[in-house]
Regions:
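C-terminal motif of bacterial Sec signal peptides marking the signal peptidase cleavage site
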Residues: 5-9
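Domain-level detector for secreted/extracellular nuclease and nuclease-toxin modules, and
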Residues: 10-204
């Protein structure tokens, strides 16, 4: 089971006041990661961290900008979710998709601890697609940002009809919210992942 969570913001969302001008009471959010020592986990696209055997991988560009983040279960060797932001600038189409003919199309994640992944690509030849969680099409504004989406840590195995059907349709729909909204909505905060808590829900 794969899931999607999205939120959006506009320029008035962080005013901290109600429509009457009175300061609103801050409610303690049980899903907050503010006690976590990693600043990236405080960003709005992050869900509550699972913790335990999971680790956080945050991919940055050479500019220092965060491209996307992953919660990875080291014992199950599986992605729990990938979260990222899309806005007008980072969905620009400046470079083509990484070629299908690239001999290293799905590289191992350089941020992985040595014991965190398989020693081979478990999806190649399995009958499943390499299903992007942060889509390649959402990261065509630079060669570096697009190439990072092909790391195996950003994949979940998907049946082709699903990956090329409803999943791709959903990805396209998310992009239209930014391109159509223009200045009324400036950012979408997206988190997508699969269910891996029960045996049989992840590859071994």
């Amino acid at each position: 089971l794969l899931t999607l969570t999205i939120c959006s913001s506009c320029s008035k969302d962080d005013s901290g006041s109600s429509s009457t001008g009175q300061k609103e009471t801050i409610v303690n959010n049980a899903n907050s990661n503010l006690k976590d020592v990693r600043p990236a986990t405080h960003r709005l696209e992050f869900p509550r961290l699972k913790g335990g055997s999971s680790t956080i991988l945050t991919h940055k560009l050479n500019t220092g900008e965060i491209n996307y983040s992953v919660e990875w279960d080291i014992i199950k060797k599986s992605n729990r979710w990938t979260c990222y932001e899309i806005y007008a600038r980072n969905v620009e189409k400046n470079v083509p998709r990484k070629p299908y003919t690239d001999p290293n199309q799905y590289p191992f994640d350089p941020l992985f601890p040595a014991n965190a992944f398989f020693t081979y690509d478990p999806y190649r030849g399995s009958g499943y697609d390499h299903g992007h969680l942060c889509p390649s099409e959402d990261r065509r504004y630079s060669r570096e940002s697009n190439d990072q989406t092909f790391y195996l840590s950003n994949m979940q195995p998907q049946v082709h009809g699903f990956n090329a059907g409803v999943w791709e349709t959903m990805e396209s729909k998310m992009r239209t919210y930014i391109t159509a909204a223009k200045i009324s909505k400036d950012t979408l905060f997206i988190c997508r992942g699969g269910t891996i808590d029960k045996a049989g829900q992840f590859m071994t």
